[in-house]
Structures are given as C-alpha cells and as structure tokens.
Amino acid sequence: ERSPLLSFSNTDMAFAGDVLVAGSYHGFNTYRLQDDGVPALLGSVVCPGGQGDVSIVGDLLIMSVEQTRGRLDCGLQGISDDVSTDRFRGIRIFDISDLARPVQVGAVQTCRGSHTHSVVSGPGADGKIIVYNSGTSSVRDEEELEGCIGESPGDDRTALFRIDVIEIPVDDPGKARIVDSPAVFADPESGVLGALWRGGDHGDETQETSQTDQCHD
C-alpha cells in the first residue's frame, strides 16, 4: 500500500549557526553544515503529523503539528477515533542539544493544530520564549480538548478567527502553555469576530471563496 503523496515531503528548514533542521510531514532531520557547505546528516526523528514547520531557539526545536493522525507518543499507527486522549495537534518542543538524539520535552495542544508558527521574542530576562501559532485545520471536538468551539461565528468563544500566543519557559519546556488566543480578524468597533471576508462571490462568473477565519502563514 502506497503512502499518501505528502507523507515524506519536506516542508520547512531552520538554521542556527552551522546547524540545519529540515521538517517534514513525518518528522525532521538534523544536519551539521560542513566547511564546504554540504550538510552532514546527524539524526532523524520519526514523528508523523505534519505540518512540520520548524524553528530553532538555542537548544530547543519548535515544530508545528496539524494533522489528526498526530500522536502524543509520535507513534506510526495514527488515530482513527473522532475523540482520543492520544491525539496531538499543536506545538511540539524538542531538546536538540544532542543533534543525533533529539528528545521531546514539551507539547502544547491547540484547538486547530499548528499549520505554522513564528517565534516573536525570547528568551528574555524572564527565560521565556513567545510564539505565535496559527492553525488552519478543523476545530477539534470539545470532548477532546476543553474550550474548543467551532461555531462560525455564532459563539464569541469560537476557536475560529484566532491565533494562539504560546509561552515556553526555556528551563522547563514541559510547562509551555497558551497564554492568550486573540481574535485577529475582529472589528475593534463592533466586536464582530468575522470582520473580513465572509465568503461567497463577487457576482456572475466570479470565483467563490470561503470565509476568512484563519491565518495561513
């Protein structure tokens, strides 16, 4: 049986000095850039779930996970249940101080997973890294993760129209957490969450597009 087309596709690269990490839908590879510029493979981590976008901050690697097959234990068997305590969608954090043997040291569950993320600050004097997270997948069942509401718009608590602000303590990444989930598409005057394009077309023979309820990148 053939694997899906994108199962092993590379999705992103991150650099730090002579270190290169290449993320994919199936995990990531670590490399050391040699004097001639050619990368030498040091390690491979199998951890399916896409999206595979990666960032390096010191000895920590931050990785985006979006697909519903992702597991907390990085297992290959995936998850078929609609609701499961084993599912992981969000931000994984790895200690890459030993590039040949990265170790997962933190994981932050989010309602829509993580299609991409941006490291916006840190670590500062408080020893914390701040990450903006954007999920573009479906909103998971609230039975699986409390507070995940997919009403559009309908409910001001909806997980749509938002990003996640994630705080990562460098000395204890296992305590990484979401500190805010602002509605970035809200109208500041009316408070309407879906203040941008609400879906539809622009008249006869024009393209029909979906409601703007997410940040892709």
Where on the chain are the PLM-derived regions?
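Feature marking well-ordered beta-strand scaffolds used for ligand recognition
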Residues: E1-D217
